[in-house]
């Protein structure tokens, strides 16, 4: 179908063009921006619902504030596609989340209109406060700093830490609370809009401050009564008492889709000389696109789709994704053991725990965007004899590292960590890559670290974790599908710290930790065809290492190559340290480690990027050839 005409949007290259429009044109411009956003994501896939929910807010912010001199910080960045279209990136917007194209999140290196990069939630207020204080220290002319944060992100403690600090500093910071679940308070029509305009006027705020000064001279009894009366009135009408207690001047709630309500409030707040302000806007995810509005997840993250029907393009496959294999295995284990509980930090669908909750709703806990709390909550349950499984993306586990050490590992509490999206994740790029969990977990004493080579092994590791009560244990698995193995009804319990041999050879040893095993097996076939007898080992455990197996491989082979989808300092590094301590590097053994490069990998196709960095069969074969002094060449791919 032909694309929707966008005559107004076509005139906008950067926000200064937008600011030349009369206010009467902005609603039509917002409609065009919404149509363009829908069209873009229908082609690229990505996050749609959040962006559709902030179309009018995005237009209003760039219209009122002098970006990029004024700073707009988008929390998480899921909602920033319309922002990118308005800020000079429309020509490249259909490269979104593709290798060499635009990021799916805000990114400082991409545009001056992205003052702070994002991907994880709840960072915007802290970053904005830092910018506001820095601006004040430099004695710059008044610069507006605006942090836009969703109500979901407000469930994280970091947001309140920042607000508490901003209130204490009386910093000149504007926070826009995008309440897209109406979880705090709905707007109440004309009265709410009128009140928001009234209380946002500088004259009202100035009068309020003067009354406060005068009130300090009154007896405490009268002062308390006056304060409580105002708090009751404003809290009853607009729900802002909590934010006022944190030192913010509260305005709202207002309809975030009504430009006639948004513009005067933003203009009023723009003129405030001091103090932090919170503007509470209520929006609806997926606004203006019926399939998104009707969907339970509001099209939060989607594949390419048909605009007319909303039907997403999905590859047909009977192979289960690793996430579904995990959730199936955990639900099976829970049917045998009523002490098994599951914990997620606001990702029940992404981690597969929604499937677990269908059968055991009372044993699944979604704690919100609160990874630190999730881990210590699990530790508390472990203290009382329960078997908590914390299902979490590798990238988000980073946020709870102190809790992993202090609350779990030191106390040797049997918390189970199911680490999803391990390794390179593809289109979401550097902020979501699961690069570091092997490194930061294998450094912890007596912490068991596993990785399955396929989906059957994943089922074994779920059962192994359920049976292990001696301390913390983890297993990591990637985004995407398995390799199509027939799945048992239930996994088996593995012996802790024992790997396995998949193919016996006598010259080359390929030791894989994780799901690159299929590429390793292809490489082994190619090496064998070249006359290089090859052993393939599935390590299973990075910690504890299978020391007997590693000694044998080191003594019986000329070249040993480790393969893992993790950062420097992981499985290969631990194996090298062991070999050095054992004196196994002193008799001619050639060791090479294949891993993720020492850089932050940008978005792109999983298969293409992993091939480019050498974590495929071609890269493995060429690594062996290089170790042997053979000429590196392009290898014909053989699929098994």
Curated annotation (Swiss-Prot):
Superkingdom, natural source: Bacteria
Record carries keyword Glycosyltransferase: no
EC nos: 2.2.1.7
Required cofactor names: Mg(2+); thiamine diphosphate
Cross-referenced Pfam families: DXP_synthase_N, Transket_pyr, Transketolase_C
Binding-site list for thiamine diphosphate: 78, 119-121, 152-153, 180, 289, 371
GO molecular function: 1-deoxy-D-xylulose-5-phosphate synthase activity; magnesium ion binding; thiamine pyrophosphate binding
Record bears the keyword Metal-binding: yes
GO BP annotations, alphabetical order: 1-deoxy-D-xylulose 5-phosphate biosynthetic process; glyceraldehyde-3-phosphate metabolic process; terpenoid biosynthetic process; thiamine biosynthetic process
Protein's pathway: Metabolic intermediate biosynthesis; 1-deoxy-D-xylulose 5-phosphate biosynthesis; 1-deoxy-D-xylulose 5-phosphate from D-glyceraldehyde 3-phosphate and pyruvate: step 1/1
Cofactor binding: number and manner: Binds 1 Mg(2+) ion per subunit. Binds 1 thiamine pyrophosphate per subunit.
Catalytic activity: D-glyceraldehyde 3-phosphate + pyruvate + H(+) = 1-deoxy-D-xylulose 5-phosphate + CO2
Keyword terms of this UniProt record: Isoprene biosynthesis, Magnesium, Metal-binding, Thiamine biosynthesis, Thiamine pyrophosphate, Transferase
Gene3D superfamilies: 3.40.50.920, 3.40.50.970
Annotated disulfide bonds: none
SUPFAM superfamilies, alphabetized: Thiamin diphosphate-binding fold (THDP-binding) (SSF52518), TK C-terminal domain-like (SSF52922)
EC class: transferase
Binding site for Mg(2+): 151, 180
Oligomeric form and interacting partners: Homodimer.
Functional description taken from the UniProt entry: Catalyzes the acyloin condensation reaction between C atoms 2 and 3 of pyruvate and glyceraldehyde 3-phosphate to yield 1-deoxy-D-xylulose-5-phosphate (DXP).
Family: Belongs to the transketolase family. DXPS subfamily.
Protein name listed in UniProt: 1-deoxy-D-xylulose-5-phosphate synthase
Origin organism lineage: Bacteria, Pseudomonadati, Pseudomonadota, Alphaproteobacteria, Hyphomicrobiales
């Amino acid at each position: 179908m032909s694309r929707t005409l966008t005559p107004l949007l076509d005139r906008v290259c950067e926000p200064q063009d937008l600011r030349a429009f009369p206010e009467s044109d902005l609603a039509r411009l917002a409609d065009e921006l919404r149509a363009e956003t829908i069209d873009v994501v229908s082609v690229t896939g990505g996050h749609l619902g959040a962006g559709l929910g902030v179309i009018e807010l995005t237009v209003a912010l760039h219209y009122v504030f002098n970006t990029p001199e004024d700073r707009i910080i988008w929390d998480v960045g899921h909602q920033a596609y319309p922002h990118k279209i308005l800020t000079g990136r429309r020509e490249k917007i259909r490269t979104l989340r593709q290798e060499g194209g635009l990021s799916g999140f805000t990114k400082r290196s991409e545009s001056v209109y992205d003052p702070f990069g994002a991907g994880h939630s709840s960072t915007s207020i802290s970053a904005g406060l830092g910018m506001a204080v820095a601006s004040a220290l430099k004695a710059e002319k008044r610069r507006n700093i605006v942090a836009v944060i969703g109500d979901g992100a407000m469930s994280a403690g970091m947001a309140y830490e920042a607000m508490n600090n901003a209130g204490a500093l009386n910093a000149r910071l504007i926070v826009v609370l995008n309440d897209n679940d109406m979880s705090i308070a709905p707007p109440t029509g004309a009265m709410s809009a009128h009140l928001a305009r009234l209380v946002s006027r500088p004259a009202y705020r100035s009068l309020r401050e003067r009354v406060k000064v005068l009130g300090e001279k009154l007896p405490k009894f009268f002062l308390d009564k006056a304060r409580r009366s105002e708090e009751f009135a404003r809290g009853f009408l607009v729900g802002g008492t909590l934010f006022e207690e944190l030192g913010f001047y509260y305005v709202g709630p207002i309809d975030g889709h009504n430009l006639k309500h948004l513009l005067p409030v933003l203009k009023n707040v723009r003129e405030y000389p001091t103090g932090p302000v919170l503007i509470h806007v209520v929006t609806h995810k997926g606004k203006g696109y019926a399939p998104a509005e009707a969907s339970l997840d509001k099209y939060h993250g989607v594949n390419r789709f048909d605009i007319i029907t909303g039907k997403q393009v999905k590859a047909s496959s009977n192979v289960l994704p690793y996430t579904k294999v995990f959730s199936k295995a955990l639900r099976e284990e829970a049917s045998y053991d009523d002490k098994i509980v599951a914990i997620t930090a606001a990702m029940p669908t992404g981690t597969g725990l929604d499937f677990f909750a269908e059968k055991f709703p009372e044993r699944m806990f979604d704690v919100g965007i609160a990874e630190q709390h999730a881990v210590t909550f699990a530790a508390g349950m472990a203290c009382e004899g329960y078997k908590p499984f914390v299902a979490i993306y590798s990238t988000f586990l980073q946020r709870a590292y102190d809790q992993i050490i202090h609350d779990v590992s030191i106390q040797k509490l049997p918390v189970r960590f199911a680490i999803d999206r391990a390794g390179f994740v593809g289109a979401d790029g550097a902020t979501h890559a699961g690069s570091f969990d092997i490194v930061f977990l294998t450094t912890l004493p007596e912490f068991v670290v596993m990785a399955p080579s396929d989906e059957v092994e994943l089922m074994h590791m779920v059962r192994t974790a359920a049976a292990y009560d001696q301390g913390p244990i983890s297993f990591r698995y990637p985004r995407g599908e398995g390799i199509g193995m027939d799945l048992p009804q239930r996994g088996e319990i593995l012996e802790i710290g024992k790997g396995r041999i998949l193919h016996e050879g006598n010259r080359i040893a390929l030791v894989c930790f994780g799901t690159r095993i299929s590429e390793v097996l292809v490489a082994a076939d190619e090496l064998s065809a070249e006359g290089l007898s090859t052993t393939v080992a599935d390590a299973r455990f990075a910690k504890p290492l299978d020391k007997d197996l590693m000694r044998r491989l080191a003594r019986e082979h000329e070249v040993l190559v480790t393969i893992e989808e993790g950062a420097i300092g992981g499985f290969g590094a631990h194996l090298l340290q062991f070999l050095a301590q054992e004196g196994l590097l002193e008799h001619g053994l050639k060791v090479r480690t294949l891993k993720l490069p020492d850089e932050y990998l940008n978005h792109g196709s999983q298969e293409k990027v992993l091939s480019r960095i050498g974590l495929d069969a071609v890269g493995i074969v060429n690594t062996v050839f290089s170790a042997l002094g053979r000429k590196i060449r392009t290898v014909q791919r053989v699929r098994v």
